[in-house]
């Protein structure tokens, strides 16, 4: 465990909301190794199961809208209306990805013009995707990164901004 910590301070009150230890190099490597180990299992999960998981995430955003909005209001000073809008949008991103995954991830036949044969474009997972998130839209930025990558079959590792870890 690192001796350095992230401190989340409510900008409106100056009060410390939470502290988190900064990950050590060894902890980061261990997290990468776990994500790498999970990638072979996750890429083989049937699309229908991935859709169900992403739909549950969308439902969590919907059912916890007030709580999640309050958290980013306290942690980063986001006005309540903006915060609830971000929570709604983040849930909607997950719902959209779940709903449209079958057609978005379907193989696409390519036009070969006058050439003989057939060619297809297939979307395949590439492995572990690392996302370094900015501070200003903590739910939205994660949703737009996580939902499509998880639907495709990639595993992800997030590094949140220090203002709202």
Predicted regions and their residues:
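N-terminal Rossmann-like NAD(P)+-binding subdomain of aldehyde/semialdehyde dehydrogenases
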Residues: 1-117
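Conserved small-residue-rich beta-alpha loop and adjacent elements
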Residues: 110-165
